């Protein structure tokens, strides 16, 4: 099993929970960590500030393409950042649990 973490942000708790629940129901992820934080970014020529909800999704590399496309489809942002982080080390027990959840 090749575990990955996928990171994205949402404008609010409602959209973060809605998308995350859908990803869980489709078994594209095994777990999510959601956390509110302050964001600063360039948008349409000026610096913006505000609150966002960051989402860390735990999954397996074979789910990456479908997960990315599903996030794009459901995400409220015009240009969501969807980053994949490959994990070269993961404890065996967690890896085995992920496999059971994702693949039965």
UniProtKB/Swiss-Prot annotation:
GO terms under cellular component: cytoplasm
Cofactor field: Cu cation
Presence of the UniProt keyword Translocase in the record: no
InterPro entries: CutA_tolerance, Ion_tolerance_CutA, N-reg_PII-like_a/b, N-reg_PII/ATP_PRibTrfase_C
Cofactor note: Binds 1 copper ion in the interface between two trimers.
Subcellular location per the Swiss-Prot or TrEMBL entry: Cytoplasm
Function as written in the Swiss-Prot or TrEMBL entry: Involved in resistance toward heavy metals.
Family in the record: Belongs to the CutA family.
Listed PANTHER family: DIVALENT CATION TOLERANCE CUTA-RELATED, FI09726P
Listed name of the protein: Divalent-cation tolerance protein CutA
Species lineage: Archaea, Methanobacteriati, Methanobacteriota, Thermococci, Thermococcales
């Amino acid at each position: 099993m090749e575990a990955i973490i996928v990171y994205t942000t949402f404008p609010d708790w409602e959209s973060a929970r809605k998308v995350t629940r859908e990803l869980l129901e489709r078994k594209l992820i095994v777990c999510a960590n959601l956390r509110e934080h302050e964001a600063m970014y360039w948008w349409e020529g000026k610096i913006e500030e505000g609150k966002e909800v960051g989402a860390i999704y735990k999954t397996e590399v074979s789910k990456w393409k479908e997960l990315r496309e599903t996030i794009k489809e459901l995400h409220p942002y015009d240009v969501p950042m969807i980053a994949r982080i490959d994990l070269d080390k993961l404890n065996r027990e967690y890896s085995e649990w992920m496999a059971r959840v994702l693949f039965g």
